[in-house]
């Protein structure tokens, strides 16, 4: 399994729609950077946020998720309460090839502020907008910015095709379009 370089990412995005919209190169200058990098793609977050709160004293249960656990916010910035987290989604829509696995890691700009981006791997054959969890590990409120970079996706090409890919087994998050809550 090898990591894929910018040339491969660009070709797959432009010829196969692997990333839409696709930004060819790094956008910087007053924003948290995003776009194509040497061995990855820096993704952006949309302006839709689910901020978790304890206002209603709900319990987080992945098998019986209570929508009173969060408040919905649509804005250019999101303030994450201390020691809390927010769910958001990417601007980019991904179509992962059958022989590729993607791993997503946080950007250093946010990591140095105590913010952790958590995303499960993008499995072979998966497609959709990526739901991202951003944890504020600090005792202070923290700000994140819509339409700017949040994390980097790394693309690994397998040596052979899997017997069963995500789309073959009708994965529960296939084709997700918004900030998607846990499903069983």
Swiss-Prot record:
Residues annotated as catalytic: 133
Keywords annotated in UniProt: Hydrolase, Nucleotide metabolism, Nucleotide-binding
Pfam name, any one: DCD
Binding site for dCTP: 107-112, 152, 166, 176
Enzyme type, top EC level: hydrolase
Catalytic reaction annotation: dCTP + H2O + H(+) = dUTP + NH4(+)
InterPro entries with a match to the protein in the record: dCTP_deaminase (IPR011962), dUTPase-like_sf (IPR036157), dUTPase_trimeric (IPR033704)
EC number: 3.5.4.13
A molecular-function term among this protein's GO annotations: nucleotide binding
GO terms of biological process kind: dUMP biosynthetic process; dUTP biosynthetic process; nucleobase-containing small molecule interconversion
Residues of the signal peptide: none
Pathway field: Pyrimidine metabolism; dUMP biosynthesis; dUMP from dCTP (dUTP route): step 1/2
Similarity remark: Belongs to the dCTP deaminase family.
Subunit and partners: Homotrimer.
Its job: Catalyzes the deamination of dCTP to dUTP.
Entry-linked NCBIfam families: dCTP_deam
Protein name: dCTP deaminase
Organism: Herpetosiphon aurantiacus (strain ATCC 23779 / DSM 785 / 114-95)
Organism lineage: Bacteria, Bacillati, Chloroflexota, Chloroflexia, Herpetosiphonales
